Amino acid sequence: MKEYEIVMTYMNACAGEAYPQRSFEEAELAAPADYIRRKHARDFDKFEKEIRPDGRIVYAWRGAVTYIYEFTEL
């Protein structure tokens, strides 16, 4: 298990929100994908995974409602 800082960004364009909502969390995970599966079990396959050059793992689902999860290993 590894410890991650998780930054979750949520934006609902349909509701006319001008600014994204962000939350922060730390968690011990075997894999970041497990966290996404727990939060979005039915929609997991809609998320795109990206590994950034700095090592961050990003899962994003962009649509009328956008979810972006950034995992940084601590």
Positions of the model-derived regions?
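A general secondary-structure signal for short beta-strands and their flanking turns/coil
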Residues: M1-E3, E17
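Short, mixed-charge low-complexity intrinsically disordered segments
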Residues: A41-L74
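A short, charged, amphipathic alpha-helix used as a generic interaction element across diverse proteins
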Residues: A27-E48
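A short beta-strand micro-motif
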Residues: E3-N12
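Short, surface-exposed beta-strand/loop "edge" segments at domain boundaries and coil↔beta transitions
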Residues: N12-Y19, A64-E70
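A short, exposed loop/beta-hairpin motif centered on an aromatic-Gly-Thr core
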Residues: A15-A30
